[in-house]
């Protein structure tokens, strides 16, 4: 699914090496459940992963495992797209062209348009994921 989302919506990331990990810990930020996050790798992580992929990973995407297990494919795609929106390719940069950017609004303008059929998807998915964690306790 991640490859398909990248190919369809983010062709500029076609050469980026992205490691996807499932996060088994409930993470909060600003009182909200973190469904996914992405980080740019540092030199150490790139070096430690250069035997797995040429020159190491450029990004690591973390997806909440409970969210993934309890959500529909459309919601999974929404989370993946949202995280990919943070990625920026700066071809004029020295060194790696892969950067991170913040939100253009609380979300991204492009995501608002793509999710107009379900504008509160993140709240709904957060509640589903919270319920999955509560069942564990």
Kindly give the residue locations of the regions a language model identified.
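Active-site recognition of the HExxH zinc-binding catalytic motif
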Residues: 78-90
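Metalloprotease/metallohydrolase-associated module, dominated by Zn2+-dependent proteases
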Residues: 1-18, 22-70, 74, 90-137
């Amino acid at each position: 699914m991640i490859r398909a989302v990248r190919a369809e919506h983010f062709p500029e990331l076609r050469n980026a090496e992205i490691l996807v990990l499932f996060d088994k810990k409930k993470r909060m930020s600003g009182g909200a459940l973190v469904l996914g996050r992405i980080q740019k790798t540092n030199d150490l992580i790139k070096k430690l992963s250069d035997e797995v992929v040429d020159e190491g990973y450029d990004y690591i995407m973390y997806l909440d495992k409970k969210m993934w297990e309890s959500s529909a494919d459309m919601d999974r795609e929404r989370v993946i797209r949202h995280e990919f929106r943070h990625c920026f390719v700066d071809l004029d940069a020295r060194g790696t062209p892969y950067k991170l950017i913040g939100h253009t609004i609380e979300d991204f303008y492009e995501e608002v348009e793509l999710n107009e059929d379900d504008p509160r998807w993140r709240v709904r998915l957060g509640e589903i994921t919270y319920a999955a964690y509560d069942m564990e306790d």
